[in-house]
């Protein structure tokens, strides 16, 4: 998952869209995704696209087009840069896996991390 990019688009009636997008972004961050873009839209009356007022539809469309242009401009032949927060989370989980592996060498996650070399010098973003 390291080096991947994600776009989160939420749309809801009333409140809750931003917190939902934040929860999804938090989960993606723990999975190793550093480049996460979020767009959240609140609707107060209708969820049917044809019944949404033109002003709101134009606002939503322009924000999504702007985001699409930014994502299109990215050079996808190179992986996304792994952020410092994601690296810190990786090292915290690495310490946890090392401790659990000392207590129980047959622990499945420990064996997986050891097989990939992540408990040694190998890093998944390199």
Question: Which ranges hold each PLM region?
Answer:
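Helix-loop-strand module that forms the ligand-binding subsite of alpha/beta enzymes
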Residues: 1-40, 112-113
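Glycine-rich phosphate/pyrophosphate-binding loop and the adjoining helix
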Residues: 34-126
């Amino acid at each position: 998952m390291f080096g991947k990019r994600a776009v989160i688009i939420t749309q809801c009636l009333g409140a809750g869209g931003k917190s939902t997008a934040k929860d999804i972004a938090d989960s993606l961050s723990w999975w190793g995704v550093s480049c996460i873009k979020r767009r959240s839209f609140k609707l107060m009356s209708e969820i049917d696209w044809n019944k949404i007022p033109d002003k709101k539809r134009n606002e939503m469309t322009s924000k999504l087009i702007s985001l699409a242009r930014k994502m299109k401009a990215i050079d996808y032949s190179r992986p996304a840069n792994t952020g410092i927060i994601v690296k810190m989370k990786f090292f915290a989980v690495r310490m946890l896996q090392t401790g659990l592996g000392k207590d129980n060498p047959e622990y499945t996650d420990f064996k997986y991390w050891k097989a990939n070399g992540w408990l040694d010098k190998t890093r998944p973003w390199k």
